Amino acid sequence: MLIDHYIMDFMSITPDRLSGASLHLIKAGGKRLRPLITLLTARMLGGLEAEARAIPLAASIETAHTFSLIHDDIMDRDEVRRGVPTTHVVYGDDWAILAGDTLHAAAFKMIADSREWGMSHEQAYRAFKVLSEAAIQISRGQAYDMLFEETWDVDVADYLNMVRLKTGALIEAAARIGAVAAGAGSEIEKMMGEVGMNAGIAFQIRDDILGVIGDPKVTGKPVYNDLRRGKKTLLVIYAVKKAGRREIVDLIGPKASEDDLKRAASIIVDSGALDYAESRARFYVERARDILSRVPAVDAESKELLNLLLDYIVERVK
């Protein structure tokens, strides 16, 4: 993908170990959902020229996403992502932290460099502001996610607020920045941001589902990771708070055995939490689709591809 080449060229820096750590997860693969949303939004609203201008902006979104993954993996002590050992497992915590910091800075440098790709000063400023806001929201979301591991005083509203920040904010930014690249006005930018936010919430709910029933060989991540960390996913909250299956409280967390986690997963499925989560994911995808239908398109094919991407979000198996 063109975005990958851009990032790899950009991050071809010395020392080699820093470059290697920074690009470890990029080279491992991934969905590239966020930069794809940026590029499709730019083309939908401004045609092929806008899409070409958006390449460094789309790369900045993926670079920021990769930075957040590296740091999240350190905090969660996750050992596998995208089917390979995580960055801190391969390079150690110190190098992984440094790689994340470097990617974070690189994401904003890419936006500055977008001026050389035909972006105006105002467009670059708007994109910079959007990503800056998203970066703060992501950190807030991660903070809530960590705090929720320490308590059971978490309800669906708390969960949704956390997800809007941790996952929704960057996908919202991806869509808004695509609109900025196309030269769209503030109202269209806002509407595309709402498309991205709702898609992001659905994406995270689907992630929660795959954390319970996903195949590790397909997802590239160990199953039950969220349960092992004691994370308050939508499924866990529903099973405990809505279905009254409080035995889950004693079956998840860092001290839980593999049998405990399997039993917790079985209880979650039996409680109806899986069906509930799937229905909520579809609700947010349909909300995104409704908003998207009201956005005028210069390129109809790109709009259709965005609609297909919404389908993928709730149907994906990894």
Swiss-Prot record:
Entry cofactors: Mg(2+)
Binding residue positions for an all-trans-polyprenyl diphosphate: 81, 166-167, 204
CDD domains reported in the protein's UniProt record: Trans_IPPS_HT (cd00685)
Gene Ontology MF: a single term: prenyltransferase activity
Keyword Lipid metabolism included in the entry's annotation: yes
A single GO BP: isoprenoid biosynthetic process
Keyword Transferase: yes
Catalytic activity, EC: 2.5.1.81
Enzyme kind, highest EC tier: transferase
Effect of residue 64 to V: Produces only C20 (GGPP) as a final product. It seems to block further chain elongation of GGPP to GFPP
Residue numbers marked as site, The 8th amino acid upstream of the first aspartate-rich motif (FARM) is an important determinant in controlling the chain elongation of C25 FGPP synthase: 64
Positions that bind Mg(2+) 2: 72, 76
Pfam families attached to this UniProt entry: polyprenyl_synt
Residues annotated as binding isopentenyl diphosphate: 31, 34, 65, 82
Cofactor binding note: Binds 2 Mg(2+) ions per subunit.
Function: Probably involved in biosynthesis of the precursor for C25 (sesterterpanyl chain) moiety of C25-C25 diether (2,3-di-O-sesterterpanyl-sn-glycero) membrane lipid. Catalyzes the condensation of isopentenyl pyrophosphate with the allylic pyrophosphates to yield all-trans geranylfarnesyl diphosphate (GFPP). Geranylgeranyl diphosphate (GGPP) is the preferred substrate, however methylallyl diphosphate (DMAPP), farnesyl diphosphate (FPP) and geranyl diphosphate (GPP) can also be used as allylic substrate.
Family, similarity comment: Belongs to the FPP/GGPP synthase family.
Subunit structure: Homodimer.
UniProt-recorded name of the protein: Geranylfarnesyl diphosphate synthase
Native species: Aeropyrum pernix
